[in-house]
Amino acid sequence: MSGQQTEEPIFFGHEVQITEMQSEAGAAGAVHGSLAAGALTTTYTASQGLLLMIPNLYKIAGEQLPAVFNVSARALASHALSIFGDHSDVMACRQTGCAMLCESSVQEVMDLTPVAHLS
C-alpha cells in the first residue's frame, strides 16, 4: 500500500491514521484490507471516485464489514465540467448491498459519520 501516512488525535479511543492514496480504486482496496484486519475505517471521495470503488463495495458488503464512505455527490464530469449536485453515482451503488445515509449539510456529515461507525 503506497501513500502518505500521518498520526492524528484519538477517535473512539484509537489513534487515527490517515493515508492518502494515489487512486480511488487503490483506496477502496486499502479500505477493504484495513476492514478485514479489524480496523475502524472510513474514506472520503467524490462521484467519479465512487464509481471506481463499486467492485470493492460488493466485497465489503458481502463480507458485512463496517465501513463508512463519505461521498460528495456531484454531477459526473462531462465536456461542460458540471459542478452541480447529482445523485446518479450514488444510485449506481444501490445494488451493492451497502446501507446509505444521506445528509443535506456539512454539519450533518460531521454528526452522522460517528453514528454510522457505531451502528
Annotated model-derived regions:
Residues 1-92, 97, 105-108, 114:
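Thiamine diphosphate
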Residues 113-119:
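Short, intrinsically disordered, charge-balanced linker/junction segments flanking boundaries
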